[in-house]
Amino acid sequence: MDNNMTDIDKVVESRAIERILSDYAYFLDMNMPEEMVKLFVDDCEVSYGPKFGARGIADYAKTLDGIGTFFKGTSHHNSGTVIDFVSPTEAVTRTIVLAVHRYAKDAPDGILYGQYHDRLVKVDGAWKFKARELRTTMTTDYHVRSFNPIGRRD
């Protein structure tokens, strides 16, 4: 990919992208949905599963309604992030996620193992999510029953 970026540019922009990935997890774990929304562009697309997602920032904000009362707490752990620059203002990423969910109701903690596949764009000097897809490898005692597959070969 010829994206006209120096190696130094790639390092600097990679750190900025890693920051937004970490901020997403932090804001989710801290029950700060209003901060999560700021990480997305207005015409974003989000898919957490085949029947759960959003098109556009207003629709995305609705998906976050009630997270503070549904969960007592969450702990999202990102690792293995890979960043490929399409251009100086667009990148695609893949990040491994382990997410533990403590429910408000009396239930065992739910655990999700999966991957985030993202498209990010740089708008007014800041990286934002254009598209975010959660692909699920497996779960334990998790509340969602329908998932986007990771695409693993048989």
Located regions from the model:
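Short, low-complexity N-terminal intrinsically disordered segments enriched in polar/charged residues
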Residues: 1-26, 30, 34, 38, ...
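A solvent-exposed, acidic/Ser-Thr-rich amphipathic alpha-helical stretch
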Residues: 33-98
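A beta-strand edge to alpha-helix "cap/lid" segment located at domain peripheries
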Residues: 2-5, 69-154
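Generic, low-specificity signal for short hydrophobic/alpha-helical stretches with a mild N-terminal bias
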Residues: 3-6, 18, 42, 46, ...
